[in-house]
Amino acid sequence: MNATNTSAFVKHLLNRFFIEYKTRDHSGIYGYTQKLFAYNSNKIENNNLTLEQISSLFDSGILPKSQVPYQVKDIEETQGHFIMFNKMLDTLDAALDQQIIKSFHFELKSGVFEDRANDYAIGDYKKRPNMISIHQTTLPSQVPEAMTELLNWYHAQDISLETLAEFHARYEIIHPFQDGNGRTGRIILFRECLRHDISPFIIEDANRPEYLEALKAYRQDGTVTALTTLFQKEQEFYFNQCEYFFAE
C-alpha cells in the first residue's frame, strides 16, 4: 500500500465502522473487527474464550454450550472489550489524552467483579506497585507525571508506525493501570492509526512470543525495530482480511 491507498483504506474503514456501529450491524467489518480484536487482545492476556464463543457473545449475547466451564472474568472482560472498542470510535475526534486513556480502562474493567473485589482502581491509575514478569514498572505515585511526559513527547512527534511502536513500548513500561495495560495499550494503537491515516492492525495471539520479545528488546536497548516489523506484518494481515468486506 502506498500513502494514497492507505489514506483511502482508512477513510473507507472508518465510514463502514460508523455506519455499522450506529445501525448495530454485526455482519460486516465492524462486527468482524470487534470479534477479532476482543479475541486476540484478551487471549494474549490468557482469556480462555474461543473466537467462536466470542462471536456468539457479540452477536447474540449468548454463549454456546461447552464441556469446559466458563470463567466469569473471561466473559466480563470480553464484554468490556466490546464497549471499549465503541468508546474508541466515540472519541476519535479528540487528541489522545489521559482522560481518554482512563475511559478505555473504565469500559474494559468496570464490569469485572474480581477487579472490584480486589479493590483495583477502575478507570484510574494503579494504587499498588505491579510488575511485568520480573520487571519493575513505574511506581503509582510517579504514574501521572510519567504519562504526562509520554503524551507530551508523543504529541510533539510526526506520527508514524515507528512513533506508535515507541509509544506502546514506553506505555507498557509505565504500566499505568493495576491490570488491563496491554489491552488499553493495543486499543490506543488501533485508534491512533485511524486518526493518522496509518493502516490499523490487531496483534494476533499467534504472534504473542514475537510481540513479547519485541517489547523486551525495547526494555533492553531502546530499539523499536522488532516491534515495528511486527506491526507491519499485522497491518498486512488485517488489510487482507478487510478486502473481503470491501469487495464489489
PLM ranges: what are they?
Residues M1-D179, R183-E248:
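FIC/Doc superfamily catalytic core
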